[in-house]
């Protein structure tokens, strides 16, 4: 694939329990800095930002165009409700040995894991299996009371319900001194994907006209946000 796409890479000594390990150039972003950039861009553009408010359909009144981009809560605001697959996911934030600082590593392909820099010194972990605590298919997520208290509240320190031990057990197969990490805490959220797509893990970005002046945007990948915005503009100009 890398050869076909003419992407640079270098073979290095393979990590334990891997057939091949490749070093590649990959762009990452600092989520803290990105937050500041987006916030400043909104303010400088005269966009009114309203936080800590529950939006209802009554709030749609008085606008030329309404774009619903509420991810797991799309069905809360749309008349035509769709079924999705909802997954309560945990993203542990850890401090790894210094040799991992600034490095992003993905073990692929299959039920494996990844680690990515988070801020200046920490990493955030991902795992195809152990990141998911609960899952359901339907029009709205079903979340246990134990996990509901953690959702979308940033890094939860010393969470009672965590799979960090399973993350560590998996990571030890591939990463030296992985069990020496410090668990800073974990973030919890609801990942929303199309139902029954385990065979290809498809994560499409969908821009739909819901009728009248209402549009919806369904996407869970930050790297598609610009394409999604451009597609929305194209649809608005076409309609």
Task: Give residue spans per PLM region.
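Amphipathic alpha-helical segments that form well-ordered structural scaffolds
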Residues: 1, 37, 41, 166-174, ...
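Flavin (FAD/FMN) cofactor-binding and adjacent substrate-gating region
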Residues: 1-45, 195-207
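General small-molecule cofactor/ligand-binding pocket signal
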Residues: 8-10, 48-50, 181-185
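Helical element adjacent to the flavin cofactor pocket in flavoenzyme catalytic cores
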Residues: 22-78, 225-235
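Central helical "cap/lid" subdomain
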Residues: 64-109, 118-123, 131-134, 145-146
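Flavin-binding catalytic cores
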Residues: 121, 133-191
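C-terminal catalytic lobe of FAD-dependent flavoproteins
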Residues: 169-239
């Amino acid at each position: 694939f890398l050869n076909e796409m003419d992407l640079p890479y270098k073979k290095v000594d393979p990590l334990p329990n891997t057939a091949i390990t490749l070093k590649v150039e990959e762009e990452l972003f600092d989520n803290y800095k990105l937050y500041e950039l987006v916030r400043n861009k909104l303010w400088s553009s005269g966009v009114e930002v309203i936080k800590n408010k529950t939006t209802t359909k009554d709030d749609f009144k008085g606008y030329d165009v309404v774009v619903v981009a509420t991810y797991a809560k799309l069905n809360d605001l749309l008349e035509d409700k769709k079924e999705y697959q909802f997954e309560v996911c945990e993203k542990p934030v850890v401090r790894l040995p210094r040799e991992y600082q600034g490095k992003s590593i993905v073990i692929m392909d299959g039920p494996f894991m990844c680690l990515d820099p988070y801020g200046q010194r920490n990493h955030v972990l991902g795992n195809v299996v152990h990141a998911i605590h609960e899952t359901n298919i339907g029009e709205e997520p079903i979340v246990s009371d134990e996990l509901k208290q953690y959702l979308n509240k940033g890094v939860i320190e010393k969470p009672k319900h965590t799979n960090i031990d399973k993350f560590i057990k998996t990571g030890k197969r591939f990463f030296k001194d992985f069990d020496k990490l410090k668990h800073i805490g974990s973030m919890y959220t609801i990942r929303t994907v199309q139902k029954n797509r385990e065979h290809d893990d498809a994560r499409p970005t969908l821009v739909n006209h819901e009728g009248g002046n209402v549009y919806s945007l369904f996407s869970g990948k930050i790297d598609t946000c610009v394409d999604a915005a451009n597609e929305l503009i194209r649809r608005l100009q076409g309609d």
